[in-house]
Amino acid sequence: MYETVLLTGITGNLGSWLAVEMLQRGTNVLALMRDANSKAATRRLDRVLEITGGSDLKDKIEIIHGDISQKGLGLKVQAKKLKRLCRIIHCAACTKFLEDDGKSHQMMNVRGTLNVLELASRLSLPVVHVSSAYIAGKRTGVVKEDEIDVGQSFNNIYESTKCRSEMLVHKWAQMNSLPAVVLRPSIVLGESLHGKTVRFTSLYDYLRVLTLIVPRMGKHWIRIAAHPDVTKNIIPVDYFAKASSYIIDRGVSGTYHITNPAPLTMKDFGEIFSRLLGLSRYRLVHVDSFLRRKPNEIEMLIQKATAVYNPYLLSEPSFDRTHTDSALADGGIQLPAMDSSYFGKLLDYACSVRWR
């Protein structure tokens, strides 16, 4: 008999690809979706399955109406459906970096996780929690997988609430003596074969601004406030899905950095995208140097449009992968090359669907 999991966040970028990978491995999915209208839920699911290549697996997915912000996830399903579950996989989250009051982050990332854990306790089920490598916040140096709160400060409310939610998971596992797997992906972009993605967020916002501005630059030089030697830890979403699914199947509790062991530097990215976008008149400069001279009009546009991501161009820690490397040692799962070919596919796909 095939295993069945309860999955939150199936229409998100991580949850959608992870769901398809698990379906291909023989797992059935009970998908929690907020849509009160079943037709609307089906349409949203159909869209992501078409993008992720999982349309032929749809009969192994059952949609159930619920809401992680509610007690018991707002579930009104028959008890026998929940009894056949082998685990809960929690992917749903508010991923916006900026929000004035932070209510959505608190409700989704903190309260939502607590509600998932309470249901898992009631059903005595193991939990898989998709966190983020960037709960490290403003830390520098090496971040180990067993470290969570070491007094770090954060760049935004997304990081801080994801850190709080992960702390809840570890505390829950200790108190209930139930297994918990925590997955910490870094920056996750489109899949490696065709560059496909379900959502255009994160680095995509920055790339879209550049694609709009470069044709208007003429002979102007621009400076970009970014430390050339700072790394940007990027992985394709299909690597995230394969690595995560393999780790989940092993069933060994722990925290796993699903990250790039050899991330590119900002200088590397500058060279790649200068070729892809035809951006030849640019310089990466340290922020203090950037601020010493008034930005020109194009520099100002880039800064304003991408301000929320600026901290990530200036600093990044190194993510230790001891647990992940051990777990994947016999899995044959390799990180695809992060090169011009890959990033070219991302841009081609984004442009082909008009970034939506």
Name each model-derived stretch.
Residues 1-87, 91-94:
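N-terminal Rossmann/SDR dinucleotide-binding element
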Residues 4-5, 30-33, 318-356:
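Amphipathic terminal alpha-helices
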Residues 191-204, 246-256:
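Glycine/proline-rich active-site loop of Rossmann-fold NAD(P)-dependent oxidoreductases
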Residues 150, 194-195, 205-239, 243-246:
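A conserved pocket-lining segment of Rossmann-fold NAD(P)-dependent short-chain dehydrogenase/reductase
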Residues 243-308, 350-353:
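Mid/C-terminal beta-alpha module of Rossmann-like enzyme folds, strongest
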Residues 212-225, 289-334:
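A hydrophobic C-terminal alpha-helical subdomain
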Residues 153-186:
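Active-site Tyr-X1-5-Lys
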Residues 86-90, 99-103, 107, 111-157, ...:
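Conserved Rossmann-fold NAD(P)-dependent oxidoreductase catalytic core, especially the SDR/UDP-sugar
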